[in-house]
Amino acid sequence: MANQPNVLAGILDVDSSEKVARFVRLCDAFNLPVVTLVDVPGYKPGSDQEHAGIIRRGAKVIYAYANAQVPMVTVVLRKAFGGAYIVMGSKAIGADLNFAWPSSQIAVLGAAGAVNIIHRHDLAKAKASGQDVDALRAKYIKEYETSTVNANLSLEIGQIDGMID
């Protein structure tokens, strides 16, 4: 199982969630181990996804992974953000082994999105006072990536079992 970053940036949507759940259940039915290669920036936003049942389909993915009795190995290749990462074979969902590339990013939210939320007041003040907002945003993004969005932190807190060098 893998995300395809060349198609919709690898996000999970209604159709891909259905496909993931079906594939994991198929592997479990035939006693085949599930190897998940993760590069997922999140779920596809939008009211069309909500009306199509993204919550229900996402729950199918959770159910498929959580109930699978076969060995499950997950490798984070690049991005692993939010609930989409959790359902894609994370430790929280019951994977047996989780690994990551050293350059991978594992967090609730990507650095740029998090900075825009966390530092919105500072960025607004900087804009009002005529400061270089882009430089300040870049500084905050760098700090957030160093402190939060890195695989080393995930290794330290036990979200992954090891790094692939």
Task: Name every feature range the model reports, one short phrase each.
Residues 1-165:
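Ligand-binding clefts of soluble mixed alpha/beta catalytic domains
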